[in-house]
Amino acid sequence: MLLLIFLNFFILRGDTLLTKEKTISDFQNALSVTTDGKENIYVLDAGTNQIVKFNNKLEYKKRNGKQGWGEGQFDYPTFIDGSSGLDIFVSDGKNHRIQRLDLELNYISSLKTDLPDFNVELKFRTPAASLILNSSELYVIDADNNRIVVYKDGRNPSGVFGDYKSGKGQLIHPVKILKDSRNFIYVLDKEQKAIVRFDNLGNYLNKLEISDLENFAIRGNTLYLFNGKEITRYDLERSSVIDKLSLPESSRKKKYTDILVLTDEKYLLLKKNELSLWVKK
């Protein structure tokens, strides 16, 4: 798979240059960005322990959150997940929980499994990221054990994968988890510099190893690989590169913390202090 990607790179002719269309500089340490079923945008700012909400035109709507351990409060959260389309999940690792909010950023519930009566084989202490499948199945990256724990109804555990028992699918340092339109699961492993793919039962499928990979996104059945300089679009059904979208020289190799694909023409890139909209023209 690795060889296939690089062979396709060599035969591509000409990159498309992305153009920056809008910038929002209103963050202290923004780490994660997501969207919901209504195309609203949510930025997780770990520096202020807040979520900032924008509409699909990147117009400010509201913000919520502060440092603490109460309901709707955070302590350096690491990941925001709108994959259900209906609500928002925040990985609040230092508080050892996943918090669920509605689309107006009102608190709904928390999942905290680091408890004495919880099965040690099926609990997490520090959640790094999360994903929702089939409306209610919650998949959590357990950062302390480098694995994925599954909660079929969002609360009761049903299994794990990606641990030492997973063979080629063993994870070493998982940091991000996404899904495609077929509900296949993709995990970014920083230590392996790879995206590890599983089916929705947690069975290992394959691995994409990319030496300069920094982040990734998925829209439909297209994988977007980002190395800080360019976005490579990869067709998951054909296992081939579609094209490359390049940033201007002045914007390359900045410290980007996340990427979100709005359409094939519009991309959001997140930095510590800035959210920027990039357009393919």
Stretches with model-predicted labels:
Residues 22-49:
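Beta-strand-rich domains and repeat architectures in extracellular enzymes and scaffolds
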Residues 26-36, 70-84, 116-134, 167-181, ...:
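Beta-rich, blade/repeat-based domains predominating
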Residues 55-59, 102-106, 152-156, 198-203, ...:
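Short loop/turn segments that connect beta-strands within beta-propeller blades
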Residues 253-281:
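Blade-level signature of beta-propeller repeat domains, shared across WD40, Kelch, NHL, RCC1
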Residues 46, 93, 143-144, 190, ...:
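Short loop/turn segments immediately following the C-termini of beta-strands
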Residues 19-23, 62-72, 110-122, 159-169, ...:
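Surface-exposed loop and turn segments in beta-propeller and other repeat-based domains
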Residues 40-43, 87-89, 137-140, 184-187, ...:
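Conserved beta-propeller blade signature
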